[in-house]
């Protein structure tokens, strides 16, 4: 499933989490990650959200897959771009994570003889590269353990968000009501 978490839609605060958008009950939109839209005076003027359109009425499993997919992608984005070490933004791509891990492991195995090692950590707000040279085993170990702790916290936050997500509003709209008289 491809979802662009950076492509948000907007609307009124009264928008439902799911709705049929045609009279034939054949096209549905499901929404998640509602965020307030504020004006210059910090007054809420609407909401933004991520939505997916289905050419049919989606099942609850499809809704859960969509919502969990959004949470997973937001968690990945937070890991990738949210880590700051010593006031320096650090790009935690999978490749960089492997490189940092390997450099720390080799430095540990060689008791620091493999140092110094220089890494491009990320970029500043103007797009200029930010480099750091690790010269001691203690410094690279502190950096690496901080990065691992950050990644673990992001993953735990994502799991907690999924565990606590309330699907009741979706179920009320998408689950047929049965009359057991």
Model-based region annotation:
Residues 2-181:
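A preference for well-ordered globular domain cores
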């Amino acid at each position: 499933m491809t979802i662009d978490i950076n492509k948000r839609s907007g609307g009124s605060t009264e928008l439902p989490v799911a709705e049929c958008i045609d009279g034939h009950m054949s096209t549905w939109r499901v929404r998640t990650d509602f965020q307030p839209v504020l004006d210059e005076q910090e007054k809420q003027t609407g909401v933004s959200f991520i939505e997916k359109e289905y050419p049919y009425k989606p099942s609850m499993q499809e809704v859960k897959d969509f919502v969990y997919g959004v949470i997973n992608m937001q968690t990945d984005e937070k890991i990738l771009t949210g880590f700051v070490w010593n006031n320096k933004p650090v790009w935690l791509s999978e490749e960089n994570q492997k490189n940092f891990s390997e450099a720390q492991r080799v430095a540990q195995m060689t008791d620091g003889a493999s140092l110094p090692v220089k890494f491009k950590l990320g970029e500043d707000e103007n797009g200029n590269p930010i480099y750091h040279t690790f010269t001691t085993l203690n410094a690279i170990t502190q950096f690496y353990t901080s990065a691992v702790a950050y990644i673990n916290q992001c993953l735990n936050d994502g799991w907690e968000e999924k565990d606590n997500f309330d699907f009741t509003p979706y179920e009320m709209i998408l689950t047929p009501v049965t009359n057991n008289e």
